[in-house]
Amino acid sequence: MTRYFSIVLSLLLAVSCVFLPVASARQQQHQPLDRIVAVVDDNVVLKSELDRAIHNVKSQYVGHEGQLPPDEVLQRQVLERLILIKLQVARAQTNGIRVSDDELNQAISSIAENNKTSVDGLRQKLVAEGISFPEFRQSVRDEITVHHLRQGFAQSRIVVSEGEVDTALAQANSGAQYHLQHILVSLPDGATSEQIAIAQKKINGIKSVIDKGELAFSAAAVRYSDSPNALESGDLGWRSLDEIPEAFAQMVQTMKPGQIVGPLRGTSGFQLLKLVEVRDSTAAAGPRQMATEYHARHILVRITDKQKEAQAKAKIDTLRARIAGGADFQTVARESSEDANNSNQGGDLGWFPSDAFGADFGNHVKALADGNVSEPFRSAAGWHIVQRLGTRQTDVTRENQRAQIRDTIGQRKLEESYERFLRELRSEAYVSLQIEEPADDHHTPSAAVTPATGAVLPAATKH
C-alpha cells in the first residue's frame, strides 16, 4: 500500500490549483477589517481565510457559475472544510507530526514547476493575486501535515489480507468497472428522530428536483451534498466491485448507465447514487508489463566497531585482487563474505529487480556485462564486490496488478475509516461559529419521506 503511504505529486498539483486562482483577487481590494468566523478548539478561522478559500473555489467554476450553490451554502461548505483542516493539523501536531522546511521547499518547487515557473516566479504570481507568500507556505505546510496524518492513520489501522486480494483479483479479471457519483445528506452520530426526519425530507427533495429535470445530478451534488467531494460534483471515479461496499455492489451490477437509486440510508446519513457509465475491466487493464531482472552474486565486508572502515576496505581490495588473479568468485564468497544470508551459496543473490537492494547497488549491477566483476563499492551495509551472471525479461503484469488491487482495497478501507475518524474529530471538538449559518433546508426542495437502507459509499481517489 505504499502508493497511498507517500506524498504524491497529485497532492502538490491540487494545492497549486487551489492557490493559483484564475480570477484576480484584486477584485477584493476594499476588504473590511479581518475578524474571526469560527473558533476551533484553541485555533481560529479568519474571515480573510474564508473569503480567500471561497474565491479560489469560484475561480474554478468560471463560465459555469450556475453549478455552484447559493453563496451562503458555499460559505458553509468551505468553512466546514477549513474547520476540518484546522482540526487535522492540530491532531497531527499532538501526534508529533512535523513538516520540515526541506520537505516544504521541495513541495513548493514542485508546485512552481507545475505552473511552469520558478519559485520566485510563483511568489510574484501569488503577490499579484493578493496572496502573501508566508500564507501560501503555511497553507502548503498544512496540506502536507494532513497528508502525513492520513498516512500514519493508514499504517496503524489498515490491513489488507492476501485473501481479499485474491477475491478482488478474480472479480477484476472477470468483471466490469463502474463510474459513480453520489449525493450525501449527512447525519450526526446518535441522530435524533427529528434530525433523521429533516435529513429524509432533504434527500427526497433533492431526488425530486433531479427527477423533474430541474437540476442535473452533478449540479445538485455541488449545491446540496454534504460529502467532502461535493464541489467535485460528487464524483467517485471508476470502481470495480471490490471497491464498492457489499451493501451497494449487488445493486450497482443491476443498474444501467444514467440510472439514479436512493435514497439509501447508511451510518453517515442518506445518499443518492448515480451510475455514469460502465467499462470492461480488461479493456482498462492495458498492455502486459515487462521488467528487467538480474542474476548476480556478491561478497560483503562489513564495517563494525572491531573492523573499521580502512580495515574493511583493505580486506575487500585483497579479495578483489584474488578474483582478478583467477580465484573462483563462489569459493572466495564462501570463505570470506560476511553476508550470512548467502555466503554459503557462494554469494548468490538469485534473480532480482535492479532496485531490490537499493538504487546504488542496482546501478553497479546494471553497469556490468554478464560475467564481469565490479570494483569494490561502498553501501550502508559495508564494502561489496559483485559479479553479474545474467539478465532476463519478466512478466510482472500479475504482480503489479496484485499490488494495485492491494492499494485500491487499502485506499477504500482508508477512506471509510478516515471518514469516521473525521466525524469523531469534529464531534469531539469545540467549534463556535461566529458567522450566520443558513438553515439546512433553506434552499433545499422538500418531498414526501420514505426511509431507505444501505451502506455508506465514501469518496475515493479517481482512477
UniProtKB/Swiss-Prot annotation:
Residues 439-463 are annotated as: Disordered. The keyword Signal applies. It holds the Pfam family Rotamase. The PPIase activity resides only in the second parvulin domain. The N-terminal region and the C-terminal tail are necessary and sufficient for the chaperone activity of SurA. The PPIase activity is dispensable for SurA to function as a chaperone. The N-terminal region and the C-terminal tail are also required for porin recognition. Residues 1-25 form the signal peptide. It is an enzyme of class 5 (isomerase). Keywords: Chaperone, Isomerase, Periplasm, Repeat, Rotamase, Signal. It is found in: Periplasm. Residues 175-277, 291-390 form the PpiC domain. It catalyses: [protein]-peptidylproline (omega=180) = [protein]-peptidylproline (omega=0). Gene3D superfamilies: 3.10.50.40, Porin chaperone SurA, peptide-binding domain. Its main location: periplasm. GO terms for cellular component: outer membrane-bounded periplasmic space. Disulfide bonds: none annotated. Its EC number is 5.2.1.8. It comes from the Bacteria. One of its GO terms (molecular function) is peptide binding. This is Chaperone SurA. The keyword Chaperone applies. Chaperone involved in the correct folding and assembly of outer membrane proteins. Recognizes specific patterns of aromatic residues and the orientation of their side chains, which are found more frequently in integral outer membrane proteins. May act in both early periplasmic and late outer membrane-associated steps of protein maturation. GO terms for biological process: Gram-negative-bacterium-type cell outer membrane assembly; protein folding; protein stabilization. The gene is surA.
